[in-house]
Amino acid sequence: MIFIIRHGETQKNKKKLLQGRSNDPLNKAGIAQAEQAREYFQNRGVHFDRVYSSPLIRAVDTAQIIVGDTAQIITDDRLLEMDYGPYEGTSLEPPPPEVLHFFMDFVNHPAPEGMESLECVVGRLGEFMEEILPAAAEGGDILISTHAIAMKGALEYLTPASGGAYWSKYIGNCEVYQIGIRDGRYLVPEETGMKGK
């Protein structure tokens, strides 16, 4: 089983600022969220055989808190958050109009200049998911620690029939989805009881 998690809260999350490639650490609430996720997995007898993470510290630390020293964390740039370019660090209350239009109606509003496109996000996350599929199909549990938009990119790749439904869905800090595998193919991702805030 694959479990994909969004990192714990950072100060930029708390302040409602766009946080893409900036390398901000978890705040106290984020550390507590990751500890709660660790308990969630421990209570269900989940022991991770492989752990992948975005190289950004908030994702790595989330994974580290969850697995401790029981597994090596493999970082992969394809798990990075969307590159917001010149919009990095801007307020989401409210966001710039062009950013709001993009996130509310990405079909008719392409990514603002300098910002990574959703197609690019889905492409790199899809490439990553296909690369780990053979090993994942052998069994065992895998943890992927990443970011909200990157996580949505993976979920969109795995469920193309969703019609973009995941883009408008809120994914909270340390929210977890599980992805099963059958006959060498991914199953539809499912929400778990580990809901983010």
Residue ranges and their predicted role:
Residues 2, 140-149:
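Generic beta-sheet signal
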Residues 11, 58-60, 81-82, 142, ...:
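Short, active-site-adjacent cap segments at secondary-structure transitions
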Residues 44-78, 156-159, 180-197:
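Conserved histidine-centered catalytic loops in small-molecule metabolism enzymes
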Residues 66-124:
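Phosphate-handling substructures
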Residues 162-188:
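Domain-level recognition of soluble alpha/beta enzyme cores
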